[in-house]
Amino acid sequence: MYLTGFADEAAQDLSSQIKATKEIGWTRISARGVNGANLHELPDDEFDKVADQLDDSGITIPEFGSLIGNWGKKITSNFDITLAEINRAIPRMQRLGTGLIRIMSYAQEPWGNNQQEEERFRRLREIHARFADAGLQAVHENCMNWGGFSPDHTLRLVEEVPGLKLIFDTANPVFQLDRS
């Protein structure tokens, strides 16, 4: 067992993230953002510098916090955006030796509205499959998304998306039916 956390909550720039991580005696960062941008959104040359800096520091990245299907994206959004994020994330995770990627199940609609569950499951099965095909594990994060509605929604998600794992982030909102 090891401890890790999102170092972008300590600082925006990578040098300060590395420093904060080392100051508490950790050697791993759950990577999400550098200089205000998610790792899968950084330009290639900037990502290469990040990867080299991590290598030089001895800090490893066991988990990648992505924007894939997050609470800011509606289920009606263009799925090509998600596919492009996946296509950028996979080689970057492989470069960093990262095995886990946090995903979500898209923004919830106001309670009582059509949640387009079948489309959610279709997308999440595709997302999971693309990472699995690359030898990586997608993990669904509890947050303000369909899978975070309730424990029943979370269990249904796991039933509908075989192989999907869960991550429970204690800093995220408590499960509740309606956050609209």
For every predicted segment, state its role:
Residues 16-24, 58-59, 93, 120-127, ...:
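Short low-complexity stretches enriched in small and charged residues
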Residues 41-49, 77-88, 112-123, 145, ...:
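Alpha-helix N-cap and loop-to-helix initiation/capping positions
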Residues 64, 128-180:
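Acidic/histidine-rich catalytic cores of soluble enzymes
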Residues 93-114, 134-143:
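Active-site groove signature of glycoside hydrolases
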Residues 1-98, 132, 165:
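N-terminal pre-domain/capping segments
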Residues 12, 17, 53, 94, ...:
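Residue-identity detector for glutamine
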Residues 9-11, 33-35, 67-70, 105-109, ...:
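Active-site-proximal loop/turn and secondary-structure-junction residues that shape catalytic pockets
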